Design a protein with these regions (language model features):
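Beta-alpha junction/loop-to-helix N-cap segments that form part of ligand/metal-binding clefts
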Residues: 21-23, 27, 42-47, 61-139, ...
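Extracellular/periplasmic periplasmic-binding protein-like sensory domains
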Residues: 246-318, 378-386
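Short, polar/charged alpha-helical segment
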Residues: 43-66, 192-199
Length: 387
């Protein structure tokens, strides 16, 4: 009877342990630290969609080929709420508790900068698809490049140059006003860089106005801008704020063209802004209208799965997944250090957003940009800008 009881107990334990075995135990675990809620949830949704599309397809083909053989990839997705402190906490949890070999995201610079600090200190590869602020890949103390942090996009100094030249040369603007969120890392950096670049190239900044995240009344700032009579208004702010600013500006009789940064790239800006944002221009990473054959396949696959074409965040995330996969293959191991070393040796990568070129010791790709116009309820390609 005792033997039977012991046998039953051991059998029960074995079944229990088997049932609790982690199905991803032998997989390559990649974390996602993204903005699924908060101020910019469309950004997180696009990033999640693209990563799942990429790795589901890779897994269907057998997974990533390492030295020990093929391995499936398991995504560990976490929401950072679009907040810097949560992004840092998620980074800590993904790396320390989930043992991910790499982390995709955060996307917003405000979240990517502190998360990058955690990734660097814990020696885990992080790639931000969409963070353009230079601080993301720089050590805060030494101002030297972080060894474990990379990005999938161009940086703000390049973007500022592109926008300033476009405003001066293509739009014929001589006077510009700037309105930006002073409490958010990316808009703050973009506003300052645009001001400096625009004036250095012969333009005049006639108003430099600020607001704080969550503000809904921009009448005081816009009244000052109206009095300054600019040719253009530069709004380096996220897609969720632009429609309200544009609406209030038009009601005040302001007719100047709006020019924006890559933070405008979600189609939500068209849904929310309507006629008030029609005719506006912004800098971006990707256009479905000038796609390569590889990009056309991505656009078709993404649209078929999600019912809408990909935005730039989706395309940049897809390319970030591709960079990680290429580095995993080259490194041959399911290890952070092998991945980092292989990723740091990539000098050129052709993705759906174009060609990436990396200088030795830098996690910032040298890439081209596009200028898009919001016209007739859609994003229309205007021109390319080369680095």
């Amino acid at each position: 009877m005792l033997k039977a009881s012991v046998f039953l107990l051991l059998t029960t334990c074995a079944v229990f342990l088997t049932g609790c075995t982690d199905p991803n135990r032998d997989a390559v675990k990649i974390g996602m630290n993204i903005e699924l809620t908060g101020e910019i949830p469309a950004v997180g949704a696009s990033s999640k969609n693209a990563a799942e599309l990429f790795f589901n397809s890779l897994n269907e083909q057998g997974g990533v080929i390492l030295a020990e053989g093929p391995k499936k990839v398991a995504l560990v997705i976490r929401d950072n709420g679009g907040k810097a402190d949560q992004a840092a906490s998620v980074a800590q949890q993904l790396i320390s508790s989930q043992d991910v070999v790499a982390m995709i995201g955060p996307n917003s610079s405000a979240c990517a900068i502190p998360a990058g600090q955690i990734a660097e200190s814990l020696k885990c590869v992080m790639i931000s698809p969409w963070s353009t602020n230079p601080k993301t890949t720089l050590d805060q103390d030494s101002n030297q490049p972080r060894r474990y942090v990379f990005r999938g996009c161009f940086t703000d100094p390049f973007q500022a140059t592109v926008l300033a030249k476009f405003a001066l040369n293509d739009l014929g603007a001589k006077k510009a006003a700037v309105l930006y969120d002073v409490s958010s890392e990316a808009p703050l950096g973009q506003a300052t860089l645009f001001r400096d670049t625009f004036t250095a190239q012969g333009g005049e900044i006639v108003a430099f106005e600020t607001f704080t995240t969550g503000d809904k009344d921009f009448s005081a700032q816009l009244t000052n801008i109206r009095e300054a009579d600019p040719d253009i208004i530069f709004l380096p702010t996220y897609y969720n704020d632009v429609p309200l600013i544009a609406q209030q500006a038009r009601r005040l009789g302001i007719t100047a063209k709006f020019v924006g940064s890559d933070a405008w790239s979600s189609p939500e800006i068209i849904k929310l802004g309507g006629a008030d944002v029609d005719g506006s221009y912004f800098c971006n990473h990707f256009s479905t209208q000038i796609a390569t054959d590889e990009a056309k396949k991505f656009i078709a696959d993404y649209t078929a799965k999600y019912g809408q074409p990909p935005d730039d965040v989706a395309a940049l995330t897809f390319d970030s997944c591709g960079l990680i996969t290429e580095a995993l293959k080259a490194g041959g191991k399911n290890e952070c250090e092998a991945l980092r070393e292989a990723l740091s040796k990539i000098r050129e990568y052709k993705g759906v957003t174009g060609t990436f070129r990396f200088e030795p010791g830098s996690g910032d790709p040298i890439k081209s940009a596009v200028i898009l116009q919001i016209k007739d309820g859609a994003f229309q390609w205007v021109t390319n800008a080369q680095p």
